[in-house]
């Protein structure tokens, strides 16, 4: 994948999704990934922000982009059930202050196929507009 991106005639981002530990994210950056997701969404917000700050310090050395997550996106990447948590605007602001490029927000969305019609909290995205610099990201949009 990295070799194909280097040969491309257009700009290509190579992104690691849902990296949960500093060693994992560091390895991806050392390999040449141009973007990583620091997924500390299962941590208390203080620990999530602290981990993201460490990843930001590392990513700057590689001129790489960082995506973080606040709230919880229902269903894990492996299909396991995850307790849904809607992102708070306060947590969005705290994470945005780390300097991340993009912010995945839990608004009632889930990975995989939805068992029932989801209730998405669009008001979170509306509240972010104009007050959060990072680009909003929605995971689980294809379910």
PLM ranges: what are they?
Residues 1-9, 18-135:
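Alpha/beta enzyme core
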Residues 14-19, 135-143:
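Histidine-centered catalytic micro-motifs
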